[in-house]
Amino acid sequence: MTSGAFTAAHLALIPQVERLAKAKVVTASTSIGTGETSIANRLKRGELVDIVIVAEHVLRQFIAEGLVLAEGLRVVARSGIAFAVREGAPRPDIGSAEALRRTLLAAKSIGFSASESGKYFTGELVQRLGIAGEVLPKSRLIGGGERVGTAIARGEVEIGLQQVSELMPVPGIAHITPLPPELQKISTFAAGVAARSPDPARARAVIEFLASPRAAEAIRKTGLETP
């Protein structure tokens, strides 16, 4: 079970994982938000899962709640946040804090997710830019496990932000542009063995592979950085 940021990398690695595990891999990609299908709620309902891949601080919270085993946690990737627009739209000017401030003030609508990037946007970024009062009322949460890029491609929001790796696979969007360095937030993603895993030893072996140099190239191709 993985959050969106690692989904593309995981899907690319499935053939290797299946050879290693000698079993077919079933993937559930969903949000770390609070909806019924969120990873937290699915774990709390007792769904049988072998591996959980989410932001490291979320995984440690799952460990504290007894949903994930403490043994075997490994960092598998790091990711930055980017903005994107609909295909055919001009490239947004977000090369500096002041440029991003102007762009967000001028945008008619802004999309964000319930995951790490959205929490950073609503809880910190716009406050640091001093524009929370102007920007948050025209910002829209893209929930239900849907990617922000999909809403951008449909024209439902003019601009949106999410992890780079979550924007890259989405058709119909363009100009995926990372936040300026002074405002960038790098999230660390980690994998752990679910407490109800039927085969913890096999799950740990897969996690070791995901954190190893053998998986690094496929992970980097999806817009993530490796440990």
Predicted regions and their residues:
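Exported/periplasmic ABC-transporter solute-binding proteins
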Residues: M1-T37, N41-D50, E56, R60-E65, ...
